[in-house]
Amino acid sequence: MQTALDFLKEHYEVAFATCEDNRPKLRLFQIMRHQGTTLYFATSTQKAVYSQLVANPHVEILAVDGKVSVRCEGCVDFDVDDEYKRWIYDNNPVLPRLYSSYDKLVYFALRIEVMDYYDLRPTPPILRHFDLRAGTETGGFVGERFMKGDK
C-alpha cells in the first residue's frame, strides 16, 4: 500500500471524478496535502464541483504516469482543521495568486476507502487492490493470459 501512497505524493495532479444528474464529471485537481490515507483538496464554493460534492460526496481519483496508475475511491468530508487549511493555502503557490485569503476557499478531505495500484511494466502485470474499509489487500493479474487456473 505504501508504494501506491508514495506514487500519489509524487503525482499530485489527478483526474477527479464526481457525478451530477447521474452523469460523470471529470476534471484535473491537485492533491494539496497527504496525511496517511487521507488526501486534502481545496476549491471554491462558486465552482460546480463544490455543488456536486455537497450533493454526492462519493468520488474517484486517478493518477497516471506511463504504465503505472493508482485509482482511489471514497467520500469527501468538509470538516478540515483550520491548521490544515492555512498550511494548504500557504504551501501552494497557485492559491495566493487566485484568492486573497485562505478563508476564501473551501477545503475537503478524501479518506481513501478503496485503492488500486496497477503496474503494467512487468510480465505479468501487477494489480494490488486495497479495501481500507475491510482492511484487506488482494492481488491479481491483468489479462486473460495470466488468469489463475488457465493453462
What does each model-identified segment do?
Residues 102-151:
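C-terminal edge-of-domain segments
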Residues 37, 81-85, 137-139:
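Short, surface-exposed linear segments at secondary-structure transitions and domain or protein termini
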Residues 1-2, 43, 91-93:
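Charged, amphipathic alpha-helical segments
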Residues 32-33, 75-79, 122-124:
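A short, sequence-level motif marking secondary-structure junctions
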Residues 1-13:
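Short, basic/aromatic recognition patches
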Residues 48-114:
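Short, structured beta-strand-loop surface elements
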Residues 11-45, 51-53, 59-63, 71-73:
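Short beta-strand segments
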Residues 23, 68, 122:
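Residue-level detector of flexible, active-site-proximal loop/helix-junction positions
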